[in-house]
């Protein structure tokens, strides 16, 4: 895993960006690709300064109120709504369309997707959610490779029953079942779908953590992982560090990953990263 202490909030897992590109002037490179001016950087950062307090309130609720799983999921979903809005994504009509994995089974196998973003008839991107990854009393929650949407009660793995998501989406269990239930396996399955149904990117929101998965890099074990705790901490140091908000935004906003009728900016950034890696 190639990380950079200057951008501690980003984990460049499996060299999503070549380590020679993900260095101390990474922000300048991304800003140049995005064509964003200094004044525009300031405008991008402003909503995140306000979001910090909302994030702290949300995190305090999770840690101090010890909510039921279903209430924690709902509060996490609501925080995600605020974050997605700042990132430029439409946030209404969540979970209106399932990702159907196998419609020849009974019940039909599906994966819950918060938002499906298309251009024409082509799926471009999924926005998905999982439970938060906030540590409570030094107890690590189930992560990307353990957490499940639903599970066999006899399994030794941590249980994430679909009923616990009932405040976010309702699942007709006679018609549908969540399969694959383990989240990283669900991601793999999505990236093996037929091309017209396969997203280029998946933005996975997990409360204090954001993941970006790419169909061209997932099989190689490469993805980006963002810590909101580290983002807010680093960006609050001084005015210079506040630009970390803009870097986060430029990497995962809708304009970068799913702009309408334009070349995907992230593809441009990745292309530049290989040209200038060494």
State what each model feature region is.
Residues 75-80, 93, 98, 115, ...:
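Histidine (H) residue identity feature
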Residues 59-99:
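Acidic-basic catalytic patches of nuclease active cores, encompassing PD-(D/E)XK
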Residues 82-123:
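Active-site metal-binding core of divalent-cation-utilizing nuclease and nuclease-like domains
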């Amino acid at each position: 895993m190639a990380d950079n202490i200057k951008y501690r909030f980003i984990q460049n897992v499996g060299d999503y960006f070549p380590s020679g590109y993900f260095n101390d002037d990474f922000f300048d490179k991304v800003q140049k690709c995005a064509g964003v001016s200094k004044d525009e950087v300031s405008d991008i950062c402003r909503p995140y300064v306000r979001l910090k307090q909302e994030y702290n309130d949300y995190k305090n609720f999770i840690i101090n109120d010890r909510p039921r799983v279903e209430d924690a999921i709902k509060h996490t979903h609501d925080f995600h709504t605020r974050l997605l809005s700042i990132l430029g994504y439409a946030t209404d009509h969540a979970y209106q369309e399932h990702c159907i994995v196998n419609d020849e089974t009974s019940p039909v196998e599906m994966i819950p997707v918060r938002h499906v973003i298309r251009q024409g008839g082509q799926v471009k991107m999924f926005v998905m959610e999982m439970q938060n990854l906030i540590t409570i009393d030094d107890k690590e929650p189930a992560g990307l490779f353990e957490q499940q949407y639903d599970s066999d009660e006899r399994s030794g793995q941590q249980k994430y029953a679909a009923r616990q998501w009932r405040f976010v989406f309702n699942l007709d269990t006679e018609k549908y079942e969540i399969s694959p239930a383990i989240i990283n396996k669900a991601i793999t399955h999505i990236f093996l779908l037929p091309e017209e149904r396969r997203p280029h990117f998946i933005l996975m929101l997990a409360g204090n953590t954001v993941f970006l998965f790419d169909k061209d890099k997932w099989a190689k074990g490469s993805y980006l992982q963002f810590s909101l705790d580290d983002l807010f901490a680093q960006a609050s140091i001084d005015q210079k560090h506040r630009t970390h908000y803009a870097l986060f935004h430029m990497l995962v906003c809708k304009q970068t990953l799913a702009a309408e009728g334009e070349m995907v900016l992230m593809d441009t950034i990745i292309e530049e990263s290989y040209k200038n890696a060494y």
